[in-house]
A protein has these predicted regions:
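Phosphate/nucleotide-binding beta-alpha loop and adjacent structural elements of enzyme active sites
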Residues: 1-235
């Protein structure tokens, strides 16, 4: 039963991603120069977007060493993809990655184990007899603004961020280099399972103050999460 549920979620996520990509194609076309993928996991986003778009250079970041090894294998025969076993943060320092029930839900932020959403999720995984992972590991984190400067990247057509509640710090850490980004695709969790210390309105207002406007919004099935696309009005 757990296997069937996972397949169903993957199917729903696939169709959600197709809608997101259709919007991205409408906004910037099928050919563009640079994608930065923060939170690459096993390369699901990179592999999907590589099939649909012609992208000159892709930079992917995945801090979890086990997920990173799978990512390496999944993109081994593809060109133009640069991957790094780092986390992205507002400051360059070692961080603690809290590994959640499934590896794609790991976060630098702490988990609120008293939240109803957390308890429901664990109950479901126990009921389905799915393997649970809940521990912490040390990871290296770098600042994306510094990376952009070091690589001399003049323009990022698409920045995708899926870091389980750490999105706002990554965005703020871009500082002046946020002006080099055309589209930002991010995920936001409205549940209280991850301790974020910010609200979605903080992200929205920060992006708005940096000349970004919200273009797209879609809810992820069976989760209190939404996908958003923001566009830089200066492009």
């Amino acid at each position: 039963m757990g296997y069937i549920l996972k397949i169903l979620l993957n199917i729903f996520d696939y169709f959600t991603l197709q809608k997101v990509m259709k919007k991205i194609e409408f906004l910037i076309g099928k050919n563009f120069s640079t994608l930065v993928d923060v939170g690459s996991h096993h390369g699901e986003y990179i592999l999907s977007i590589k099939k649909k778009f012609n992208i000159k250079e892709i930079y992917g970041f995945e801090p979890n060493p086990i997920a990173f090894e799978i990512l390496k294998k999944n993109i081994i025969n593809l060109s133009g993809i640069n991957i790094y076993n780092y986390g992205i943060a507002d400051t360059e320092e070692d961080k603690i990655l809290n590994q959640n029930i499934e590896s794609s839900s790991s976060s630098i932020n702490s988990l609120n184990k008293n939240s109803k959403y957390y308890k429901k999720k664990y109950f479901l995984f126990n009921f389905l007899n799915l393997k649970k992972v809940s521990n912490s590991i040390n990871i290296k984190a770098i600042n994306l603004a510094n990376f952009i400067d070091e690589k001399k990247i003049d323009k990022i057509d698409l920045l995708k961020i899926d870091t389980e509640g750490y999105e706002f710090k990554i965005i703020k850490g871009l500082e002046k280099n946020i002006s080099k980004i055309k589209l930002i695709h991010l995920e936001h969790h409205f549940d209280d399972m991850i301790i974020k210390n910010y609200k979605f309105s903080d992200i929205h207002n920060y992006l708005k103050n940096n000349n970004f406007t919200k273009i797209f919004k879609i809810k992820m099935k069976f989760r209190k999460s939404f996908e958003y696309i923001y566009m830089n009005k200066n492009f």
